[in-house]
């Protein structure tokens, strides 16, 4: 039986309205009763995740910023990785040929150059929001990650530009069809989970994980049991064809799967 369960948030644990369902919350509590370590592995900021954890009364480790930070149950930083300052400076100051909006993250919060109210819908549960500032004024040595939000085809073209300019100095991934992230080289949820599991005296084979987007690829592919959401990006399913696909986040599929796993661990699972 797995000893650690790692969960992506958006499109996985959260429902489409960006809330946690009652069944999901109850199932997470059941896992803790079985002494299974909980880990939330997300692109969201730790400041937001602490608020969400506080409303749940659950102990969980946090992998935030898509692996740029790991925090203990007590809130201490176990691991940190920032963008190379030269990379951050280039991304923030270059005139990219794109209509996508740029968003910069550091330990102090989420920063962007203009009001984009539609982006706040994903954060209604926590109330977390961006700060509007001149992005070019942000110190490059304090940047954890940068992301671009916009049309998927536009982001694909932007990814080509970023790859040509940055070469092998950063890790690029889609955390959603409309969000392209620029992360420190070698930084992802999978590498962060490897650091955390080692800290806890576990192996990745002792872990299970759930996800729906390409920023979950390394994590899902490295654990003992990786589960892909039925609403996942097609690219993720194609990249990991050997992994099981469960139901939709709107049906609290993670809870459905885990309830079966806890109650009938030796029986085959069907998402229906």
Curated annotation (Swiss-Prot):
Pfam families: Hydrolase_3 (PF08282). Mg(2+) binds at residues 8, 10, 212. It comes from the Bacteria. It catalyses: 4-amino-2-methyl-5-(diphosphooxymethyl)pyrimidine + H2O = 4-amino-2-methyl-5-(phosphooxymethyl)pyrimidine + phosphate + H(+). It is an enzyme of class 3 (hydrolase). Belongs to the HAD-like hydrolase superfamily. Cof family. This is HMP-PP phosphatase.
């Amino acid at each position: 039986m797995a000893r650690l369960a790692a969960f992506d948030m958006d499109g996985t644990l959260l429902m489409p309205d960006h809330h946690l369902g009652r069944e999901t919350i109850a199932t997470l509590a059941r896992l803790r009763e079985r002494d299974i370590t909980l880990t939330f592995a997300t692109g969201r900021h730790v400041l937001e995740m602490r608020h969400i954890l506080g409303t749940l009364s659950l102990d969980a480790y946090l992998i935030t910023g898509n692996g740029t930070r790991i925090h203990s149950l007590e809130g201490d930083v176990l691991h940190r990785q920032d963008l190379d300052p030269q990379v951050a400076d280039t991304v923030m100051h270059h005139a990219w040929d794109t209509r996508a909006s740029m968003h910069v993250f550091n330990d102090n919060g989420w920063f962007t150059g203009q009001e984009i109210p539609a982006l706040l819908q994903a954060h209604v549960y926590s109330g977390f929001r961006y700060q509007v500032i001149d992005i070019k004024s942000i110190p490059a040595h304090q940047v954890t990650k940068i992301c671009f939000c916009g049309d998927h085809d536009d982001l694909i073209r932007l990814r080509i530009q970023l790859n040509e300019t940055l070469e092998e100095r950063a890790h690029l991934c889609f955390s959603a069809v409309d969000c392209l992230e620029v992360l420190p080289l070698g930084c992802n949820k999978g590498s962060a989970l490897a650091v955390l599991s080692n800290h806890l005296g576990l192996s990745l084979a002792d872990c299970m994980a759930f996800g729906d987007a390409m920023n979950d690829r390394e994590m899902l592919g490295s654990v003992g049991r990786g589960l892909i959401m039925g609403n996942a990006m097609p690219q993720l399913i194609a990249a990991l064809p050997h992994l099981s696909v469960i139901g939709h986040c709107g049906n609290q599929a993670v809870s459905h799967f885990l309830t079966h796993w806890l109650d009938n661990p030796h029986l085959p699972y069907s998402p229906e």
